[in-house]
């Protein structure tokens, strides 16, 4: 009861800022995820802003969680033992993780700590192999699963965040992000489909409650983009210190709501360094930036 009261109070406070009629402006730009790739600048992640969740191997007593849960997934019942607590950096994202071993593998499923819903599950099979089903055929299965899902809001396909697991785990991943007031938001649904038999082997909608209580989003896109461009240009200059020309591209932007209820925009920025006269055929590093809004 106390937990729900606290959530309602936070939502009321946050609604006055994130969901008001005023247009939010950028407060500052921070590095929110470490640089990935061949080069780095030595820049450090702001400790106050983290976009990476963490797992804690707590006992059910320590986490005040049920020691076992029975859920129905794809028409079949599974009973799992409490395995860990996942602490999300985003609003309403904390989950309890349960583990269920069965004959051909292991199922992990996650229960939302606020609403008690299954928001994430994945199967780990002992003999997962790449099958003959194509990306397009598996995509049709994922699209159908999305239509049947009981989720609120409008979601569209987003290949930018997809990963190809066909060779390593025998499945294709499909990502759908939510649109609110014309903005892409960091509420994504991920569905992975086996290329061997068309089974859904992973399903994630862990951030579906991120924007509960918010009816309207309004922020100054131009000012946010300019702030990110300034940061990225400075970052590129540092990467060019070794004498190699560097270019950057803002690849994607998603409005997000952090655990404390504050709002901002996540930007994916890619960098490409020239090895000589010609640029490489792909970007060789990326960072995530977070623009705090006020």
Regions found by a protein language model. Give the residues of each.
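C-terminal motif of bacterial Sec signal peptides marking the signal peptidase cleavage site
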Residues: 13-17
């Amino acid at each position: 009861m106390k937990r729900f009261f606290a959530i309602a109070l936070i939502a009321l406070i946050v609604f006055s800022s994130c969901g008001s009629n005023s247009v939010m402006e950028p407060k500052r730009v921070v590095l929110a995820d470490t640089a990935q790739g061949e080069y780095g600048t030595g820049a450090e992640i702001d400790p106050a802003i983290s976009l990476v969740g963490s797992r804690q191997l707590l006992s059910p007593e320590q986490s005040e969680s049920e020691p076992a849960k029975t859920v129905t997934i794809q028409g079949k019942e599974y009973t799992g033992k409490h395995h860990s607590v996942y602490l999300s950096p985003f609003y309403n994202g904390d989950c309890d993780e349960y583990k269920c071993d069965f004959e051909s593998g292991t199922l992990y499923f996650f229960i939302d700590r606020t609403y008690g819903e299954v928001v994430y599950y994945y199967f780990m099979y002992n003999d997962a192999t790449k099958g003959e089903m194509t990306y397009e055929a598996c995509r049709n299965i994922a699209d159908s699963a999305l239509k049947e899902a009981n989720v609120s809001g409008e979601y569209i396909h987003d290949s930018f965040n997809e990963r190809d697991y066909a060779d390593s785990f025998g499945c294709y991943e499909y990502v759908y992000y939510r649109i609110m007031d014309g903005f892409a938001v960091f509420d994504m649904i991920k569905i992975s489909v086996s290329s061997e038999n068309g089974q859904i082997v992973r399903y994630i909608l862990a951030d579906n409650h991120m924007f509960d209580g918010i009816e309207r989003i309004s922020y100054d896109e131009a000012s946010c983009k300019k702030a990110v461009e300034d940061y990225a240009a400075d970052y590129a200059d540092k990467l060019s210190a070794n004498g190699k020309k560097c270019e950057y591209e803002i690849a994607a932007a998603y409005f997000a709501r952090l655990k404390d209820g504050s709002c901002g925009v996540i930007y994916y920025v890619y960098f490409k360094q020239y090895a000589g006269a010609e640029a490489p055929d792909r970007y060789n590093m990326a960072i995530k930036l977070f623009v705090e809004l006020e």
